[in-house]
Amino acid sequence: MVKLSVCIEMFWRDLPYEERIARVAALGYPAFEFWGWKNKDLGAIKAAKEKANLPLAALCIEPNFSLIRRNAQAELVQGMKETAFVARDLGCKTIIATVGNVYDDETYEITRRRVVRNAAAVVKVAEDHGLTIVLEPLNTLVDHHGYWLTRMAQAVDIVEEIGSPAAKILDDLYHQQIMEGNLINNLSAYISHIGHFHTAGNPGRHELLGGEQDFRAIFKAIDATGYAGYVGLEYSPTLDTTVSLKQALSLVEG
């Protein structure tokens, strides 16, 4: 059965993070996740996760949206070392990394080589700490105009060149629906490279029911691959938050 994780950045936004964690646990979810770790009360988050006995499925590298940057490798490596310390303290094994936006004054291949170099340096730190980096393609048509990494095959090309078991892909089923669709075929073909999933309904980035994706079929396909990681819910609810998250949970439990 697919294991769902709740991205607490998107839900109960008026509440402290520790209260959000408690509510995720009360609904019966098996894990939670969040984005960046800076400017958060990590002690309170750790206490809340331990009280709820709830694993942290993923968090983002600091600095994020940065793997494309020029002359940034030392900063990225240092940021990954700091992120690894936080992840170890919180018991998190999966680190989300986004790439950043296109440089208009250089060719695709020059950019690609730098992204691979920067990502490989960060992945080496992750590998040394028993962590996995998941590179996330995003959509450029609605949410992230100018973002460089947009398609699954492009991400596969990068992680294959890095050639480390600590280099994987975050397959976001909202972003990929917008950019190329073909969700089930792609996730089935690339599952050995996928280390995490995100979900949201399209259009709108809202609930999983009512959009153009059939998440029951998608979850069945993920399950059929033998994938043992988490599928993160990263959407903006239009319903009451508790009602919305109960609805999402019913897709894997009902």
Model-predicted segments: where are they?
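Histidine-acidic metal/acid-base catalytic patches
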Residues: 1-28, 91-93, 149-171, 175-254
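N-terminal small/glycine-rich loop or linker at the start of catalytic domains
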Residues: 1-10, 56-67, 99-103, 142
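Conserved beta-strand positions in the central sheet of alpha/beta enzyme cores
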Residues: 33, 58-60, 96, 134, ...
